[in-house]
C-alpha cells in the first residue's frame, strides 16, 4: 500500500470519492453498443482472481475498459506534477495488475481484450466490432471441434 507524502485536502478527498470504478462512462458506452448489436454479456463477474468489466463466458472472452490516467496510458509524458512518488507507485501497480490479470486469464484459455477509455470514446463501434469478431472466431472454433467429433 502506498502512503501519501502530504495530507490530502478535503476537496481532493471528495474528488477522489466521486470517481467510480464500476459503470464508468466508457463502460456504459461500450456496453450500450454491444447490447444494441445483440451481444449479451455479464458485468463485473468474478473470473479466477479477476473481475473483467464485461465478459462473454460462453466464449471465454474478458473485456477491460481501462481509463487512460488510472491504467497508465501515456503516463510517462509527465502529466503528474504533484505528489509524483505516490502517483508513480499507484499507476505502476495498476499497470502491473493489468498485466498479471491478462496473463492469468490467457493461461486459462480466455481471450482478453483491453480498450483505453480514449479509444472507446473515439470509436465505440470499432471497439464493439473487435469484441464481436472475437466472439465469431470462438464460434467457428467451437463448430469445428463439434464437427470433428462426428
Task: Give the ranges of each region predicted by the language model.
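Nucleic-acid endo/exonuclease domains
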Residues: 1-114, 118-150
Amino acid at each position: 500500500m502506498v502512503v501519501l507524502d502530504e495530507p490530502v485536502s478535503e476537496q481532493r478527498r471528495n474528488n477522489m470519492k466521486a470517481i467510480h470504478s464500476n459503470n464508468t462512462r466508457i463502460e456504459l458506452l461500450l456496453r450500450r453498443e454491444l447490447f444494441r448489436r445483440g451481444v449479451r454479456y455479464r458485468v463485473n463477474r468474478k473470473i479466477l482472481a479477476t473481475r473483467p468489466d464485461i465478459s462473454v463466458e460462453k466464449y471465454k472472452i474478458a473485456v477491460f475498459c481501462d481509463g487512460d490516467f488510472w491504467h497508465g496510458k501515456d503516463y510517462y509524458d509527465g502529466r503528474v506534477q504533484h505528489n509524483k512518488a505516490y502517483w508513480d507507485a499507484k499507476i505502476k501497480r495498476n499497470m502491473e495488475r493489468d498485466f498479471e490479470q491478462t496473463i492469468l486469464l490467457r493461461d486459462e484459455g480466455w481471450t482478453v481484450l483491453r480498450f483505453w477509455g480514449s479509444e472507446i470514446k473515439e470509436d465505440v463501434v470499432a471497439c464493439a466490432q473487435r469484441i464481436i469478431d472475437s466472439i465469431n472466431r470462438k464460434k467457428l472454433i467451437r463448430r469445428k471441434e463439434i464437427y470433428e467429433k462426428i
